[in-house]
């Protein structure tokens, strides 16, 4: 294992260990993943709601089909395509997801289903311009997906506990 991979893994770990509120905010994990994977990052719920987002200044945003604000819904057909992805897909041609804006062929996507305890909770969607994802990127993406999935489960459990108390 390379030292760089270990260092990047530790950056993700810090989200879990250095958090006083005991909650990982989805934008925080997007910030970290964007930094270490040099990508624009979205956390999307199973229903298509944007839970977290980070766009880098050096990568032009794709506005087509994607809402770039937390709480808004992405295009329903795009969400259906994302939910059909059952395992990590790297270096995805974004035209296969329905994007057709100018220069879209220059982008590469990394699609990571968020599955915890056999339940699909959403998708981690990353993309970058003029570069491919390598094996280290995939490892870090999958690790980040685990952190996001655990936080999603914690959020669901807290909501259920609150409803039970009412």
Residue ranges: model-predicted function:
Residues 1-166:
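Hydrophobic, helix-rich cores of sensory/ligand-binding and other regulatory modules
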């Amino acid at each position: 294992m390379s030292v760089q991979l270990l260092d990047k893994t530790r950056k993700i770990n810090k989200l879990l260990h250095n958090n006083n509120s005991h909650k990982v905010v989805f934008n925080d994990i997007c910030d970290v993943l964007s930094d270490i994977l040099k990508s624009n990052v979205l956390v999307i719920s199973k229903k298509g709601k944007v839970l977290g987002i980070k766009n880098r200044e050096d990568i032009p945003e794709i506005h087509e089909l994607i809402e770039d604000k937390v709480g808004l819904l992405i295009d329903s057909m795009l969400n259906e395509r994302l939910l059909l992805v059952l395992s990590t897909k790297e270096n995805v041609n974004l035209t296969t997801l329905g994007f057709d804006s100018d220069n879209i062929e220059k982008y590469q996507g990394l699609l990571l289903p968020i599955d915890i305890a056999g339940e699909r909770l959403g998708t981690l969607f990353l993309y970058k311009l003029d570069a491919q994802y390598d094996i280290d990127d995939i490892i870090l993406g999958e690790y980040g997906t685990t952190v996001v999935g655990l936080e999603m489960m914690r959020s669901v459990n807290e909501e259920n506990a609150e409803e039970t108390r009412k």
